[in-house]
């Protein structure tokens, strides 16, 4: 395609992603700007979802610690935290029909939820978006950040939003609209787990050279409306065991009773699993047939579905947080605390810490004659420091660092020792005394997969009944996923022959199973040959393929802005 002339816009700060971390950073910067008489300091947030909250998926039980700091009067301001946790239970599923409730004293303290709230994180984020706009943050939903822009010295200059109206052949259609260049003093990347631009930045600046490999899980969620007689508002249930234990997969589940007779339920399967026959979506469907879970769902109706990879490497896997011209925040860096099964409060805190550091850097530049605002003179930007290392220092001195450090062994213990022994290790580490050493998990998730001839067990997944259990296509339908059909695939293969020639014979092409949206298929042609088919329009942007493909042959890039799921109340 020929060179395209693009319009550009200048901001002091550009933030990629309107999730908990991105919006918290934007809010903190604008709060400080107003308090310190820099009202013209401009902040822009771009969001690839059709609206703020459209791509937000979480359990969620929210710990309000960071929110208390950002908005001490959040209750009076109408934040949608309406259901305090009233009961907190943990279970071991011993088989497909039996279970055992764990005494509260046996549960690691990190998983105690007194003082927390059952929420729709999507609705919390929508509220944060409103608060950001009240502070005059420019929030642009429906604009996907597709490229990173660089200065000649290698520092980040900003981002380019994706072109609209490019056909499958890569050529402009009659609907073509070029993307914008958004330039900034500082660009913050808040894309969530496995952000495609964050991934590039980590590689380009070698930000993970001193970190353990990052680790991930796939979270699969359903929202149900249940019989009011069975609903117990504020009841929080977590558990592990069956069905994951049958394949040796580390994983767990949740079931939360929210407001309006709704329950949020789902599973998280660690992507370190080694059996190529594991099918996380069907593991969830099978899990719902357990009597402990089924009792709540019978007579109810499934109203929404979604899936998203979660980052779980924690303290040991954090990359360097800063680089010239920008920072990584939230799950783009990996701040989720898996020992709590929570990342919203940590994402928010990382954004707030970064926001403080960014504001201080801008204020220092202004004191030396630099300008702020939409109409500033960009040639004067050399008075502003390039790399805001103060963000790292603020993190090091914060409760966020302390919380992640204290939980650093949780994930590695589960991976090294399994659910039962690892669980015992974590009980001692969290409830009795701190283990005085650090465990490391140095095998990337994609390398954990064994070949089909090296495993003996193949799970049996019953056919869905359409009432309690479902297939992937009907599930994607209620995720409200929409993409422009006539656009290039956003799922890029480095080598188109690998799925059939390498992955199929070695691992029975696991993309057929690890994708929770049915994007990848092996199709048999009339002549008996096999073909790898990508149904990109089904994609719910979970990023599992980018993580788990054993050949690391699939790269997820952003499709047109506004595409993907449209999660309501998730």
Regions found by a protein language model. Name each.
Residues 334-340, 352, 356-415, 533-535, ...:
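Active-site-proximal substrate-binding core of FAD-dependent oxidoreductases
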Residues 38-39, 122, 126-127, 131-295, ...:
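Predominantly flavin-linked oxidoreductase catalytic cores and closely associated redox partners
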Residues 100-121, 130, 158, 268-270:
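Helix-loop-beta segment of a Rossmann-like dinucleotide-binding subdomain
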Residues 307-338, 475-486, 499-514, 521:
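FAD-binding beta-loop-beta segment adjacent to the flavin cofactor pocket
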Residues 414-467:
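C-terminal auxiliary extensions adjacent to catalytic cores
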Residues 13-44:
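N-terminal Rossmann-like FAD-binding beta1-loop-alpha1 element of flavoenzymes
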Residues 505-537, 543-566:
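Iron-sulfur cluster-binding cysteine motifs and their immediate structural context
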Residues 40-41, 46-97:
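N-terminal FAD cofactor-binding segment of flavoenzymes
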């Amino acid at each position: 395609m020929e060179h395209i002339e693009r319009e550009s816009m200048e901001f002091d700060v550009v933030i990629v992603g309107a999730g908990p971390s991105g919006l918290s950073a934007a809010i903190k910067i604008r709060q400080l700007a107003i308090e310190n008489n820099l009202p013209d300091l401009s902040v822009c947030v771009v969001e690839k979802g059709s609206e703020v909250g459209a791509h937000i998926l979480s359990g969620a039980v929210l710990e309000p610690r960071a929110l208390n700091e950002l908005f001490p009067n959040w209750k009076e301001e109408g934040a949608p935290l309406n259901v305090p946790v009233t009961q907190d239970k943990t279970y071991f599923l011993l088989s497909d029909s039996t279970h055992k409730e764990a005494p509260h004293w046996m549960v690691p303290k990190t998983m105690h939820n007194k003082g927390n709230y059952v929420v729709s994180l999507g609705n919390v984020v929508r509220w944060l978006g409103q608060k950001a706009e009240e502070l005059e943050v420019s929030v642009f939903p429906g604009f996907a950040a597709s490229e990173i822009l660089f200065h000649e010295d290698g520092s980040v200059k900003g981002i380019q939003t994706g072109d609209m109206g490019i056909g499958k052949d890569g050529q402009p259609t009659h609907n073509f609209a070029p993307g914008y260049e958004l330039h900034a003093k500082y660009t913050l990347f808040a894309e969530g787990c496995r952000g495609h631009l964050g991934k590039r930045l980590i590689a380009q600046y070698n930000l993970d050279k001193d970190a353990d490999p990052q680790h991930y899980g796939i979270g699969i969620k359903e929202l149900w409306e249940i019989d009011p007689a069975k609903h117990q508002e504020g009841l929080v249930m977590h558990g592990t065991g069956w069905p994951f234990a049958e394949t040796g997969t580390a994983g767990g589940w949740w079931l939360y009773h929210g407001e309006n007779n709704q329950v949020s339920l789902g599973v998280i399967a660690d992507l370190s699993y080694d059996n190529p026959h594991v099918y996380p979506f069907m593991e969830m469907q099978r899990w719902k047939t357990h009597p402990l879970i089924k009792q709540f769902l019978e007579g109810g109706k499934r109203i929404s579905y979604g899936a998203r990879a979660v980052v779980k490497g924690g303290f040991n896997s954090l990359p360097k947080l800063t680089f010239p011209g920008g920072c990584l925040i939230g799950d783009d860096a990996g701040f989720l605390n898996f020992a709590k099964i929570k990342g919203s409060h940590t994402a928010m805190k990382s954004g707030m810490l970064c926001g403080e550091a960014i504001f201080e850097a801008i204020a220092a530049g202004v004191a030396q004659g630099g300008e702020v605002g939409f109409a500033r003179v960009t040639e004067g930007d050399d008075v502003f420091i390039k790399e805001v290392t103060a963000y790292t220092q603020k993190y090091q001195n914060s409760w966020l660092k302390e919380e992640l450090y204290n939980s650093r062994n949780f994930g590695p213990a589960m991976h090294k020792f399994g659910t039962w022994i690892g669980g015992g290790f974590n009980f001692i580490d969290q409830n009795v005394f701190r283990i005085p050493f650090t465990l490391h998990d140095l095998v990337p998730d994609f390398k954990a997969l064994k070949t089909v001839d090296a495993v003996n067990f193949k799970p049996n997944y019953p056919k869905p009944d359409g009432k309690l259990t479902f297939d992937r296509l009907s599930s994607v339908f209620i995720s409200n996923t929409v993409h422009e059909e006539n656009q290039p695939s956003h799922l890029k293969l480095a080598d188109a022959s690998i799925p059939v020639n390498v992955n199929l014979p070695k691992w029975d092409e696991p993309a057929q199973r690890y994708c929770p949206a049915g994007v990848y298929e092996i199709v048999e042609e009339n002549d008996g040959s096999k073909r790898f088919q990508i149904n990109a329009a089904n994609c719910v942007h979970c990023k599992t393929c980018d993580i788990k493909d054993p050949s690391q042959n699939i790269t997820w890039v952003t499709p047109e802005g506004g595409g993907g799921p449209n999660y309501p109340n998730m």
